[in-house]
Amino acid sequence: MLQPKRTKFRKQFKGRIHGASKGGTDLNFGAYGLKVVEPERITARQIEAARRAITRYMKRSGRVWIRVFPDLPVTSKPTEVRMGKGKGSVDYWAARVAPGRIMFELDGVPEDVAREALRLGAAKLPIKTRFIQRIVE
């Protein structure tokens, strides 16, 4: 699963996702991509589940690029613990994705295979996404 090797601080504020994505909105590596339509936090487990679904359908042919990285530590307190006594320990890692962000890119497969692979990957994610492809001139 994806997570940072080391961080400057162990815990972070929750934060909010405002507006559209500043960067990562264009296809840079592959010919096909999965674009985010709504803002959300995506966990490392969800990214990994989507990646597995995509690569499994492609039968190891072609190439997959993951364009998001879970660098946000999400904390939680144990069950049945009273409020207070500090912030909980890090439970999992997440990535903030804003609308317009490209999450996955594919190349080396036909369009119908890429479309279906990304559809299966999108089913593992808790957000609305859109299939996009590079415009060849």
Swiss-Prot record:
Name the PROSITE patterns on file.
Answer: RIBOSOMAL_L16_1, RIBOSOMAL_L16_2
Under Pfam families, the record lists: Ribosomal_L16 (PF00252)
Provide the assembly information.
Part of the 50S ribosomal subunit.
Q: Which SUPFAM superfamilies match?
A: Ribosomal protein L16p/L10e (SSF54686)
- Which PANTHER family does the entry mention? 50S/60S RIBOSOMAL PROTEIN L16 (PTHR12220), LARGE RIBOSOMAL SUBUNIT PROTEIN UL16M (PTHR12220:SF13)
Which source organism? Answer: Bartonella bacilliformis (strain ATCC 35685 / KC583 / Herrer 020/F12,63)
Keywords of the record: Ribonucleoprotein, Ribosomal protein, RNA-binding, rRNA-binding, tRNA-binding
* Protein name listed in UniProt: Large ribosomal subunit protein uL16
